[in-house]
A protein has these predicted regions:
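Long, low-complexity, compositionally biased intrinsically disordered regions
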Residues: 1-148
């Protein structure tokens, strides 16, 4: 988990690199920019993969960075072998005890979350719908699967 703190007296967010001790800051209201910079510093492979997704599908920018938040908080459990149609379990960011199953249905990824179920999740030009949970599983596979 990235530890980004808010300094009320300075009215800024701060992130300290655990390896180098370097301190990154961002003004109040810009926590998302500091988060992106911290990810780029600590996990360049994840940062680059997120940028590639966004470059190819700009409509996925918001859910991509939410997916990165999930990954950096160790919220993705991808199964080595699918359990039925379930490929992964991904934490809910709104319910601390909730997890969503990411599965395959008719060759496409599906999620149990409200965003995906209500057809509100963004659609790519290829016609695929992506919520943050599906993208978290995808980015985890792209950046983590070969590391173990």
């Amino acid at each position: 988990m990235l530890d980004i703190q808010y300094d009320r007296s300075a009215r800024e967010y701060r992130f300290t690199d655990p390896d180098s001790g370097e301190i990154l800051t961002a003004p109040s209201g810009q926590k998302h920019q500091l988060f992106k910079a911290a990810v780029g510093l600590l996990d360049p492979a994840l940062y680059d993969a997120a940028l590639r997704v966004i470059e190819n599908n700009p409509q996925l920018e918001r859910v991509t960075w939410k997916a990165v938040e999930i990954i950096t908080s160790d919220g993705v459990e991808v199964f080595p072998e699918p359990r039925g149609d379930v490929q992964a379990m991904v934490i809910s960011q709104s319910d601390e005890y909730g997890r969503y199953a990411v599965s395959t249905e008719d060759g496409y990824y599906a999620c149990q979350c409200e965003h995906w179920q209500s057809f509100a999740a963004p659609i790519t030009q290829q016609g695929n719908r992506y919520c943050k949970h599906i993208l978290a599983m995808y980015l985890w596979r792209v950046t983590r699967e070969d590391r173990f």
